[in-house]
């Protein structure tokens, strides 16, 4: 069995980054991946402006007198255009263009307005005080977004602020999804003896949609090798990646491995993790392939740990980060046999001492999916580790946005 780290390294080294691109209006580019470095065409701000409501002043005037007349007003979008006489200030609002010659802006709370309309300043401001300088946020020619960045509710408004109307992106990844097994029934149909609902395909589709993939649903395939091969050949014609659920363990009716050897190549099909040992990765003639285990928890764990980064690579999402890991104290004993990296469902929180404390949630069988609902992390127990006693330190992996 291949350790998870080696499996992930092998997979990411083999998977290509996209080369095709398309150009979209920014209002249609949410959750897409930026396909080029984006350079600012302007300075932001494009002019010196006031950071406060107050008075624009020249320090030379204040050095002669701390009381000045008011020459006029400047508003955002309506700059002061009058004559700025000596020994006067300009009333200015936040965002308004700084009048030519101003050295500082004094906030209105530090100014006394006199009965005759003049204003008295309580202290001499510093040079440049409360002035936002041209290019202070973004300079003309700055790279504001790197290739491989996710376009979202933070990055797209930045492009809008620069007047950038369109952006080059990578195409959405096309992913074919299918389940295998005579025992599977679509959700909504009554169950007969020995049947179960096909939750894995539903789960995978939800995860793919959250990753902004274009999902091609090939449904449920019976345990029939000829139909399975036909579906594989059709799926690879339409998709960049084919994902199956079930059919990768060592069973008489598990055809995935055999078909993959026939129409493509298997790179690995067993990894040293629990749950999720029977995970397959390979290459069809025209598409890549990931085979998830049939047990629901195993399918979700392997998707999270392996398929998620694979999709990031194929999508061009080079800024994707692996899930964060933290140290925590376990509040209960944990059962663990050495030999495989173990991902147990857990719930973590801060205890009264301000420490991160974690406990397992529910039974940890690979077929027991309900424990995920009350979990917010994986408890990651090292491959060589055995049973864990309450009070010991363990590694946890808080769920990222994919599972929240």
What do the predicted segments below correspond to?
Residues 4-5, 165-292, 296-302:
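Helix-rich terminal scaffold detector
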Residues 22-27, 77, 138, 261-404:
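Flexible glycine/proline-rich
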Residues 48-50, 61-63, 81-85, 98-100, ...:
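Solvent-exposed alpha-helices and their adjacent loops that cap or buttress functional pockets
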Residues 1-64, 68, 312, 317-345:
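Short, low-complexity N-terminal leaders and the immediately following helix N-cap/first helix
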Residues 2, 15, 23, 55-217, ...:
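Short, glycine/charged-enriched hinge/interface segments at domain edges or termini
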């Amino acid at each position: 069995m291949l350790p998870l780290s080696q499996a992930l390294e092998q997979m990411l080294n083999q998977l290509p980054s996209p080369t095709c691109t398309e150009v979209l209006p920014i209002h249609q580019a949410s959750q897409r991946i930026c396909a080029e470095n984006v350079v600012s065409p302007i300075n932001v701000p494009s002019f010196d402006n006031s950071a406060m409501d107050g008075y624009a002043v020249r320090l030379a005037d204040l050095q002669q007198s701390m009381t000045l007349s008011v020459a006029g007003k400047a508003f955002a979008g309506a700059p002061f255009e009058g004559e700025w006489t000596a020994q006067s200030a300009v009333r200015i609002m936040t965002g308004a263009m700084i009048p030519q010659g101003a050295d500082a802006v004094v906030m209105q709370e530090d100014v006394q307005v006199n009965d005759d309309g003049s204003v008295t300043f309580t202290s001499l401001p510093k040079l440049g005080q409360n002035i936002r300088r041209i290019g202070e946020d973004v300079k003309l020619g700055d790279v504001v977004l790197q290739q491989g960045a996710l376009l979202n509710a933070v990055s797209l408004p930045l492009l809008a602020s620069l007047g950038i109307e369109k952006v080059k992106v990578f195409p959405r990844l096309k992913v074919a999804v299918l389940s295998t097994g005579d025992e599977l029934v679509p959700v909504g149909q009554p169950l007969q003896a020995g049947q179960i609902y096909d939750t894995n395909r539903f789960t995978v589709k939800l995860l793919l949609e959250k990753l902004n993939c274009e999902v091609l649903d090939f449904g449920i395939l019976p345990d029939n090798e000829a139909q399975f091969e036909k579906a594989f050949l059709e799926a690879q014609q339409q998709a960049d990646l084919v994902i199956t659920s079930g059919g990768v363990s060592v069973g008489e009716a598990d055809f995935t491995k055999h078909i993959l050897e026939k129409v493509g190549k298997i790179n690995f099909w067993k990894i040293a993790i629990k749950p999720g040992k029977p995970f397959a990765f390979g290459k069809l003639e025209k598409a890549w392939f990931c085979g998830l285990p049939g047990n629901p928890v195993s399918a979700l764990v392997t998707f999270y740990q392996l398929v998620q980064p694979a999709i990031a690579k194929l999508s061009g999402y080079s800024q994707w980060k692996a899930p964060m890991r933290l140290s925590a104290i376990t509040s209960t004993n944990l059962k663990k046999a050495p030999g495989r990296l173990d991902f147990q469902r857990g719930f973590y929180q801060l205890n009264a001492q301000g420490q991160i404390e974690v406990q397992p949630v529910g039974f940890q069988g690979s077929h027991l999916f309900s424990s995920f609902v009350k979990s917010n992390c994986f408890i990651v127990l090292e491959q060589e580790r055995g049973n864990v006693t309450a009070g010991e330190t363990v590694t946890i992996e808080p769920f990222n946005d994919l599972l929240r």
